[in-house]
Amino acid sequence: MTRQDLASLIRNIPDFPIPGIQFKDITTLIGNGQAFSEVIDRLHERYQNQQIDAVVGIESRGFIFSAPLAYRLGVGLVPIRKPGKLPAATYQIEYQLEYGTNRLEIHRDAFQPGARVLVIDDLLATGGTIAAACDLIEMAGGQVAELAFVIELTFLNGRERLRERPVFSLIQF
């Protein structure tokens, strides 16, 4: 499958979750076994020789791609979650959204010091969530090797916010 084939499987939902937003629905992509496998295969091919120590998935759609990729790479999976979801001691960070603030957490013992961490999320929009996730990873002793996204909304310029970090996206809109 080509990248264009994969992109054609992403459904556009107008006015969700609020009016004016064009939501990129990945359920049609992950519901197609061949396409879902292709996404994981392409990510695995990119990272298999990059000495990644852990894969971080961002709640919640990031988990869909981070878990099978961590398995394929033979490394651990570290979740970054919304507040109150992790049972042990955590680092927390609050970050700005267009319409308020949000918080994320990671376990304090998530990594060995200096671990090379690959961060996976489904979509790069403005970059606010992933920038906060990078700060959490560094608080926990990890080093961000690369940020990987299945989808990038280029018109929102999230990559600019992350310009000091390597960014990869499989599909751009």
Curated annotation (Swiss-Prot):
Enzyme class, spelled out: transferase
GO molecular function: adenine binding; adenine phosphoribosyltransferase activity; AMP binding
Gene Ontology CC terms, in alphabetical order: cytoplasm
Pathway(s): Purine metabolism; AMP biosynthesis via salvage pathway; AMP from adenine: step 1/1
InterPro entries recorded: Ade_phspho_trans, PRibTrfase_dom, PRTase-like, UPRTase/APRTase
Main location: cytoplasm
Glycosyltransferase in keyword set: yes
Single biological process term from Gene Ontology: purine ribonucleoside salvage
Subcellular location: Cytoplasm
CDD domains: PRTases_typeI
Keywords recorded for this protein, A-Z: Cytoplasm, Glycosyltransferase, Purine salvage, Transferase
SUPFAM superfamilies: PRTase-like
PROSITE patterns: PUR_PYR_PR_TRANSFER (PS00103)
Catalytic activity: AMP + diphosphate = 5-phospho-alpha-D-ribose 1-diphosphate + adenine
E.C. designation(s): 2.4.2.7
Family: Belongs to the purine/pyrimidine phosphoribosyltransferase family.
PANTHER family tied to this protein: ADENINE PHOSPHORIBOSYLTRANSFERASE
Complex formation: Homodimer.
Function: Catalyzes a salvage reaction resulting in the formation of AMP, that is energically less costly than de novo synthesis.
Protein name per its UniProtKB record: Adenine phosphoribosyltransferase
Native source organism of the sequence: Chloroflexus aurantiacus (strain ATCC 29366 / DSM 635 / J-10-fl)
Lineage: Bacteria, Bacillati, Chloroflexota, Chloroflexia, Chloroflexales
Gene that encodes it: apt
